[in-house]
């Protein structure tokens, strides 16, 4: 199967999905030259379904994300099946809850691979779950594509079966943002972050980047994931801090922001936060007035006017999100918009790699073709399949690089004020998965 290219007949069957879509490039012979006119109707997918295992945080601390990850995954699969499937085959999503728990995460990988007999596994967010489950995926020799943001993939600490092609990692994010923060907000910075791997990535990589730019980390304030009251941590923030850099996750984030406002009041330092602290939360909620004028990182702007492209509008419509970033059916149900796009883009990366590698069924030969094809990718072009923007893919790291947004809270809404370049987040590779055996 290795070396096989998608045939013209197969490409024509799935061409409807390719119109306006991003395409995986840098592999050699690619599909775009075979795209017919947009009016062409794709053939209905047929044959044995391609089964994609979805490790989802339906319960536990990641449930808010999990609900929107699942909604996005279902929307992407629906679009695929309306436009020819994958290589002409229907796509079936096989979802399994891991409870946002590392131990259960390992069990889910085993269940999906050994019992459900899926072709691929994808979708894991929380880094502690990824770090626990990824080694088992490697042992079972099944491709495992995560939507996590952690540096654990690009670090080389996992294995050749693990990829993160649909979302950027923390190291790239903070490398791109650090110059803007130091230049515009101040050099003396206190970091407040969750006490687990994701938070440590922020601590290590933003701290190092700020210091290279002449900044100084005044204090580090790690907070346990299960914490429900935060007031006792705020006295650890030095009074002469210029900027409080905060990135919190989980169900206590609203309490965290409110208590921070009660503690500092009008005398607060400048704030730079990550939308992780506010995913699923209405910026206009009572108690969040404290955030007015502060700055927030977004991977994909929640408000439709933040990045108004036709691809973004298409994606927003397909996942059922309104112009303010909430569900079209329930305006109180706020999305995880800066993360869930990674689910959509990862599923379409799977589609692209399957069709260009000639993958047909689980097994060493076809998995090798799939993995080596994806490792040879260089770009995922902006389009309906990649609405957040083009991605530079580094095959040796199994990691995508993209652009970041800085938004300011203005009149209880998020207003984009800055967008980085892809190269701003690039860093020297420290690993090379392509040298590992399969």
Regions found by a protein language model. Name each.
Residues 2-18, 27-438:
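Extracytosolic ligand-binding ectodomains
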């Amino acid at each position: 199967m290795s070396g096989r290219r998608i045939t013209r007949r197969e490409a024509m069957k799935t061409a409807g999905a390719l119109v306006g879509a991003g395409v995986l490039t840098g592999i050699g012979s690619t599909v775009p030259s075979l795209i017919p006119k947009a009016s062409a109707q794709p053939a209905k997918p047929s044959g044995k379904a391609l089964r994609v295992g979805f490790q989802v945080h339906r319960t536990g601390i990641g449930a808010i994300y999990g609900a929107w990850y699942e909604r996005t995954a279902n929307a992407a699969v629906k679009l695929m099946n309306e436009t020819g499937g994958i290589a002409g085959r229907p796509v079936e999503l096989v979802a399994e809850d891991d409870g946002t728990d590392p131990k259960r995460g390992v069990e889910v990988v085993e269940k999906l691979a050994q019992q459900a007999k899926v072709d691929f596994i994808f979708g894991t967010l929380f880094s502690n779950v990824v770090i626990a489950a990824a080694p088992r995926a490697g042992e079972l020799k099944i491709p495992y594509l995560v939507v996590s943001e952690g540096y654990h993939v690009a670090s080389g600490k996992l294995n050749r079966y693990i990829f993160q092609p649909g979302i950027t990692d923390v190291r790239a994010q903070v490398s791109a943002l650090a110059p803007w923060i130091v230049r515009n907000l101040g050099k003396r910075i206190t970091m407040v972050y969750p006490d687990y791997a994701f938070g440590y990535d922020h601590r290590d990589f933003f701290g190092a980047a700020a210091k290279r730019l002449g900044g100084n980390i005044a204090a580090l304030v790690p907070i346990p994931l299960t914490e429900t009251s935060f007031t006792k941590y705020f006295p650890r923030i030095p009074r002469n801090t210029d900027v409080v850099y905060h990135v919190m996750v989980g169900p206590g984030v609203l309490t965290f922001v409110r208590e921070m406002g009660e503690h500092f009041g009008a005398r607060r330092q400048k704030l730079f936060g990550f939308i992780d602290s506010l995913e699923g939360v209405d910026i206009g909620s009572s108690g969040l007035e404290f955030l007015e004028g502060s700055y927030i990182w977004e991977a994909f702007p929640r408000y439709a006017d933040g990045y108004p492209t036709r691809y973004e509008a298409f994606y927003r419509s397909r996942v059922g999100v309104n112009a303010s970033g909430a569900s079209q059916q329930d305006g109180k149900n706020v999305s995880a918009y800066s993360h869930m796009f990674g689910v959509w883009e990862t599923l379409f990366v799977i589609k692209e790699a399957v069709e260009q590698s000639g993958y047909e069924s689980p097994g060493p030969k076809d998995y090798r073709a799939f993995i080596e094809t994806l490792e040879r990718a260089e770009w995922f072009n902006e389009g309906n399949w990649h609405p957040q923007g083009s991605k530079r893919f580094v095959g040796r790291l199994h990691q995508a690089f993209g652009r970041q947004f800085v938004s300011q809270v203005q009149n209880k809404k998020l207003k984009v004020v800055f967008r980085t370049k892809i190269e701003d987040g690039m860093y020297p590779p420290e690993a090379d998965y392509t040298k590992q055996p399969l």
